[in-house]
């Protein structure tokens, strides 16, 4: 689920991050981006 994406992600401060995006898509979200080094999934 989307919370596991956040836990796993070590990404840049801002912007697109492939691993985060993949995880979010598997969780049924539209896209994943990074905000302050955390993955955020957007519906």
Swiss-Prot record:
Protein's cellular compartments: Secreted
InterPro entries: Ergtoxin (IPR012622), Scorpion_toxin-like_sf (IPR036574)
UniProt GO molecular function: potassium channel inhibitor activity; toxin activity
Tissue: Expressed by the venom gland.
One Pfam entry name: Toxin_17
Recorded GO CC terms: extracellular region
SUPFAM superfamilies referenced in this protein's UniProt entry, alphabetically: Scorpion toxin-like (SSF57095)
Disulfide bond positions: 5-23, 11-34, 20-39, 24-41
UniProt keyword list: Disulfide bond, Ion channel impairing toxin, Knottin, Neurotoxin, Potassium channel impairing toxin, Secreted, Toxin, Voltage-gated potassium channel impairing toxin
The organism's place on the tree of life at top rank: Eukaryota
Its biological purpose: Reversibly blocks Kv11/ERG potassium channels.
Domain notes: The presence of a 'disulfide through disulfide knot' structurally defines this protein as a knottin. Has the CSalpha/beta fold, which comprises one or two short alpha helices connected to anti-parallel beta-sheets stabilized by three or four disulfide bonds.
Family membership: Belongs to the ergtoxin family. Gamma-KTx 4 subfamily.
The protein's name in its UniProt record: Potassium channel toxin gamma-KTx 4.11
Organism: Centruroides noxius
Organismal lineage: Eukaryota, Metazoa, Ecdysozoa, Arthropoda, Chelicerata
